[in-house]
Design a protein with these regions (language model features):
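Non-catalytic accessory regions
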Residues: 1-67, 78
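Conserved NTP-handling cores and scaffolds of large molecular machines
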Residues: 15-18, 87, 161-172
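Long, charged, glycine-rich C-terminal linkers/tails
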Residues: 89-99, 170-183
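Alpha/propeptide regions of enzymes that mature by internal proteolysis
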Residues: 148-152
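Low-complexity, intrinsically disordered Gly/Pro/Thr-rich segments
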Residues: 182, 186-194
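Generalized protein targeting/export and membrane-interface segments
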Residues: 14, 42-43, 53-144, 194-212
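A short, glycine/Asx- and small/polar-enriched loop/turn
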Residues: 33, 100-102, 186-189
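Mixed-charge, glycine-accented linear interaction segment located at domain edges/termini
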Residues: 156, 160, 164, 207-212
Length: 212
């Protein structure tokens, strides 16, 4: 299982850096993680910094979904690094703004013992960069390769999440991924979180039903 420890998230949680400076740290950490480690003090240390960020963002909302949303975001942020080879951090407050248009969304619903839907929404430039990171191919404009790449990423990630739920005796089935353009999500028990990455910012959306 991937570690939930993230040097860059520890730094971000301490509010020491403006967003532009944090983006520079993410880019540099992608090339050499020790560059971020040198900025880390003992006071910054947190073995589960993504969990800390998501719990703060949720506060007292959606208590029945809290464990699932926190666990999913920990898995999502780990996958950013292991599957997309991209350094990223998540905000500690809910996201309320829609993405700049044109933007694209990819999501997938899990049904069974629980109902859960999750995915991402990104402006076109960021969506393409994320697709390039996953496919390891250049994608200069929106096409089927971009769409298919992020559908596959979400499908693999959500499959891993479904397996982790199964280990807790929570059985779920994966539905087919969904794709949308210029989406303003409105799911039940919805949580939107902004993720800042070395290729740009986007949002992760979690809900108990489809939001596309």
């Amino acid at each position: 299982m991937a570690s939930n420890f993230s040097i860059v998230q520890c730094l971000f949680n301490r509010d020491k850096y403006e967003l532009e400076e944090m983006r520079r740290i993410l880019v540099e950490a992608e090339q050499d993680e020790s560059s971020a480690a040198k900025l880390l003090s003992e006071d910054d240390m947190d073995i589960n910094p993504v969990r800390t960020a998501v719990l703060r963002s949720m506060g007292k909302i959606h208590p029945a979904q809290m464990d699932y949303y926190v666990d999913y975001m920990e898995m999502f942020m780990a996958a950013m690094k292991t599957m997309l080879h991209t350094e990223a951090v998540v905000e500690r407050v809910p996201c309320t703004e829609d993405e700049e248009q044109p933007c694209y969304a990819t999501s997938q619903r899990l049904s069974g013992d629980i109902n859960f839907a999750a995915g991402l929404i990104a402006s076109e430039p960021v969506y393409l960069k994320l697709a390039e990171r996953y496919s390891e191919e250049e994608i200069p404009e929106m096409d089927e390769l971009a769409k298919d790449s992020l559908e596959e990423f979400i499908n693999v990630l959500n499959g891993m999440f479904s397996v982790s739920l199964g280990e807790r005796k929570i059985e779920t089935d994966l539905e087919l991924p969904r794709f949308g353009k210029n989406v303003s999500p409105h799911g039940s028990h919805q949580l939107r979180l902004r993720v800042h990455s070395s290729v740009g910012s986007f949002q992760v959306v979690m809900a108990t039903d489809e939001f596309i």
